Amino acid sequence: MFGGDNEDKIYPRMHLFYEEWTEEAADLYIKMDEEFFRLLNVLPVKKGFLPTALDYYESKDAKSLAAKLSAIQGFKGILSPMAETADGWIADYSSRYFTEDFPFGLRYIWQLAHDNHVLCPNIDMVYEWGINKINIYS
Protein backbone atom coordinates (compact mmCIF):
# COMPACT_ATOMS: atom_id res chain seq x y z
CA MET A 1 0.00 0.00 0.00
CA PHE A 2 2.70 2.49 0.96
CA GLY A 3 5.81 1.00 -0.64
CA GLY A 4 7.19 1.11 -4.15
CA ASP A 5 5.69 3.84 -6.32
CA ASN A 6 3.50 4.94 -3.39
CA GLU A 7 6.48 5.75 -1.15
CA ASP A 8 5.74 8.97 0.77
CA LYS A 9 2.68 9.64 -1.39
CA ILE A 10 0.04 12.12 -0.22
CA TYR A 11 -3.47 10.74 -0.68
CA PRO A 12 -6.63 12.82 -1.09
CA ARG A 13 -8.56 10.62 1.38
CA MET A 14 -8.31 7.89 3.98
CA HIS A 15 -8.33 4.40 2.45
CA LEU A 16 -10.12 1.32 3.72
CA PHE A 17 -7.49 -1.31 4.53
CA TYR A 18 -9.25 -4.45 3.31
CA GLU A 19 -12.05 -3.13 1.12
CA GLU A 20 -9.49 -1.47 -1.15
CA TRP A 21 -7.03 -4.38 -1.14
CA THR A 22 -5.26 -4.54 -4.50
CA GLU A 23 -4.19 -7.44 -6.69
CA GLU A 24 -0.61 -6.21 -6.29
CA ALA A 25 -0.91 -6.45 -2.49
CA ALA A 26 -2.55 -9.87 -2.79
CA ASP A 27 0.27 -11.07 -5.05
CA LEU A 28 2.87 -9.98 -2.50
CA TYR A 29 0.86 -11.62 0.30
CA ILE A 30 0.80 -14.90 -1.68
CA LYS A 31 4.56 -14.75 -2.30
CA MET A 32 5.24 -14.10 1.38
CA ASP A 33 2.91 -16.95 2.34
CA GLU A 34 4.79 -19.31 -0.01
CA GLU A 35 8.05 -18.27 1.66
CA PHE A 36 6.51 -18.81 5.08
CA PHE A 37 5.55 -22.36 4.09
CA ARG A 38 9.10 -23.02 2.82
CA LEU A 39 10.22 -22.01 6.32
CA LEU A 40 7.67 -24.31 7.95
CA ASN A 41 9.04 -27.20 5.87
CA VAL A 42 12.40 -26.98 7.68
CA LEU A 43 10.96 -26.46 11.16
CA PRO A 44 9.89 -29.30 13.46
CA VAL A 45 6.18 -28.61 13.04
CA LYS A 46 3.39 -30.93 11.95
CA LYS A 47 2.88 -30.68 8.20
CA GLY A 48 -0.57 -29.57 7.09
CA PHE A 49 -1.62 -28.06 10.41
CA LEU A 50 -1.95 -24.62 8.86
CA PRO A 51 -3.69 -23.79 5.57
CA THR A 52 -2.05 -21.54 3.01
CA ALA A 53 -3.53 -18.06 2.63
CA LEU A 54 -5.11 -19.11 -0.67
CA ASP A 55 -6.72 -22.17 0.92
CA TYR A 56 -7.86 -20.29 4.01
CA TYR A 57 -9.49 -17.55 1.96
CA GLU A 58 -10.84 -20.01 -0.64
CA SER A 59 -8.95 -18.26 -3.44
CA LYS A 60 -6.90 -19.43 -6.42
CA ASP A 61 -4.80 -16.39 -7.34
CA ALA A 62 -4.10 -12.74 -6.51
CA LYS A 63 -7.26 -11.51 -8.23
CA SER A 64 -9.58 -13.84 -6.33
CA LEU A 65 -7.71 -13.24 -3.05
CA ALA A 66 -8.02 -9.46 -3.40
CA ALA A 67 -11.73 -9.84 -4.14
CA LYS A 68 -12.22 -12.14 -1.15
CA LEU A 69 -10.35 -9.90 1.32
CA SER A 70 -12.26 -6.84 0.16
CA ALA A 71 -15.61 -8.60 0.61
CA ILE A 72 -15.25 -10.15 4.09
CA GLN A 73 -17.97 -8.62 6.24
CA GLY A 74 -15.86 -8.61 9.41
CA PHE A 75 -13.18 -6.54 7.64
CA LYS A 76 -15.59 -3.85 6.45
CA GLY A 77 -14.77 -0.36 7.65
CA ILE A 78 -11.25 -1.11 8.90
CA LEU A 79 -9.18 1.95 8.10
CA SER A 80 -5.64 2.05 6.77
CA PRO A 81 -2.83 3.28 9.02
CA MET A 82 -2.94 6.87 7.82
CA ALA A 83 -2.75 10.34 9.33
CA GLU A 84 -4.35 13.52 8.04
CA THR A 85 -2.10 16.47 7.24
CA ALA A 86 -2.80 19.92 5.80
CA ASP A 87 -1.99 18.53 2.34
CA GLY A 88 -3.94 15.26 2.56
CA TRP A 89 -3.47 11.79 4.00
CA ILE A 90 -0.11 10.08 4.53
CA ALA A 91 1.06 6.75 5.92
CA ASP A 92 1.12 6.76 9.72
CA TYR A 93 4.29 4.88 10.61
CA SER A 94 3.54 5.36 14.31
CA SER A 95 0.45 3.14 13.90
CA ARG A 96 0.43 -0.25 15.59
CA TYR A 97 0.31 -1.77 12.08
CA PHE A 98 3.98 -0.77 11.98
CA THR A 99 5.11 -0.43 15.60
CA GLU A 100 3.69 -3.83 16.62
CA ASP A 101 3.29 -5.97 13.51
CA PHE A 102 6.85 -5.53 12.24
CA PRO A 103 9.00 -5.83 15.40
CA PHE A 104 6.68 -8.22 17.26
CA GLY A 105 5.19 -10.24 14.40
CA LEU A 106 6.96 -10.39 11.08
CA ARG A 107 10.34 -10.08 12.80
CA TYR A 108 10.07 -13.59 14.24
CA ILE A 109 9.27 -15.14 10.87
CA TRP A 110 12.12 -13.14 9.30
CA GLN A 111 14.54 -14.21 12.06
CA LEU A 112 13.57 -17.89 11.86
CA ALA A 113 14.04 -17.82 8.09
CA HIS A 114 17.52 -16.34 8.45
CA ASP A 115 18.48 -18.68 11.30
CA ASN A 116 17.42 -21.66 9.16
CA HIS A 117 18.93 -20.37 5.90
CA VAL A 118 15.58 -20.22 4.11
CA LEU A 119 15.56 -17.67 1.31
CA CYS A 120 12.62 -15.31 1.71
CA PRO A 121 13.23 -12.30 -0.56
CA ASN A 122 9.70 -10.92 -0.25
CA ILE A 123 9.60 -11.28 3.51
CA ASP A 124 13.05 -9.65 3.64
CA MET A 125 11.90 -6.76 1.46
CA VAL A 126 8.72 -6.06 3.43
CA TYR A 127 10.34 -6.52 6.84
CA GLU A 128 13.32 -4.29 6.06
CA TRP A 129 11.06 -1.63 4.53
CA GLY A 130 8.76 -1.59 7.59
CA ILE A 131 11.55 -1.60 10.16
CA ASN A 132 13.28 1.25 8.33
CA LYS A 133 10.05 3.27 8.35
CA ILE A 134 9.63 2.73 12.09
CA ASN A 135 13.24 3.78 12.72
CA ILE A 136 12.95 6.90 10.54
CA TYR A 137 9.62 8.09 11.95
CA SER A 138 9.96 7.14 15.61
Descriptions of predicted regions:
Residues I134-S138:
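Short terminal or interdomain "cap/linker" segment that borders an active site or interface and mediates
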